[in-house]
């Protein structure tokens, strides 16, 4: 088995000679065999091998015994061993995560700390060929992204180095045979024998049937995984270029231009969405599936100009005319604001703009457009106020004298619904709407009649 693993490491360039390697060791057959293999290769490749074990504190004394077992194993073989006891149940409750995801996050944080401490370039974990088969099958059945269908990667960047999986070349049966041959006595987790978990049901009932058809099943699935990963890498490069052409980044949010997006080939559309979501989630994708991607595509393609769908972890996708907004600001459309507008002042607004107010002795020469408004202090009730829209809002339009609903003004200007709820409206103390900045002026704007004093209002972006 060592020869097969050695060849796999060479073929995928998993390690460099003289490297420091953190080996994750739970005490089970896979990780114990992995540590033993690295021990066998240590002198040949001049490796510094550090064993890393985490007690997740799920099983009390039993977990502590596993930690002591790993320590003894390392002491007997003169392997540096780093251990940690982490209250994963407490972290799980505070973060609202599943047990396995919480344990994985805590474990990998510990690995990252050890990489810094020992200046290690690699973390090796014990996923094997059967894990690959189970993972791909589960994702095919449940639904996943194109990248997810490629299964477990052989090597990926991790904390300035790489996370590697040398055992993807071998099966569970080969690992168990290796343990017997080398006289290793790994600890066995009894939960692996129960059908309570989806992976266990695939392991006990589905994979054995497939292996009857092909005893080298894990090798076929690994070949499939590597081909899919290569295809995905190429398509991701195309998707990254396409994404830059159709996306507008807005702080934690992003907006997609629907027209240019729909001109892309369908395979690129899917991957552009996957890449966009990956960036929005901060590089840690949640449980996203092809179903979610399909829903976003339907939202972009359908004839209706508006709509909204919910994605995991509070992300919303909001269609408004020719834009699709991806936002975590789930409640922004429900929260209004109300500010008094002093003079002079610079009043920052929640939508990223500001209203600048000042006194002027002369009527401004340049106040064309809807980003300026001139107030005659004698003809309005002070103080001025800035607020968000309310049901039934109407204003008297400048030039016509007629009234119009603010809702109609927003619709005619094609302002997305999400932005309407944050759009500023300037009124006087009597509640008369004077100005919808950037969109419409009311009939209450001051005229150039030689008054001694005016209030000048300007609406501009905060970063301008």
Swiss-Prot record:
Molecular functions per Gene Ontology? ATP binding; tRNA(Ile)-lysidine synthase activity
Chief subcellular location: cytoplasm
**What subcellular locations does the record give?**
Cytoplasm
Annotated keywords: ATP-binding, Cytoplasm, Ligase, Nucleotide-binding, tRNA processing
- GO CC, one annotated term: cytoplasm
The domain of life for this entry's organism is: Bacteria
SMART domains xref list:
TilS_C
Q: Name one GO biological process term.
A: tRNA modification
One Pfam family named in its UniProt record: TilS
Q: Where, by residue number, does ATP bind?
A: 26-31
EC numbers, comma separated: 6.3.4.19
**Reaction it catalyzes:** cytidine(34) in tRNA(Ile2) + L-lysine + ATP = lysidine(34) in tRNA(Ile2) + AMP + diphosphate + H(+)
Q: Which HAMAP family match?
A: tRNA_Ile_lys_synt (MF_01161)
Chain's role: Ligates lysine onto the cytidine present at position 34 of the AUA codon-specific tRNA(Ile) that contains the anticodon CAU, in an ATP-dependent manner. Cytidine is converted to lysidine, thus changing the amino acid specificity of the tRNA from methionine to isoleucine.
Domain text: The N-terminal region contains the highly conserved SGGXDS motif, predicted to be a P-loop motif involved in ATP binding.
Which PANTHER family has this protein been placed in?
TRNA(ILE)-LYSIDINE SYNTHASE-RELATED
UniProt name for this protein: tRNA(Ile)-lysidine synthase
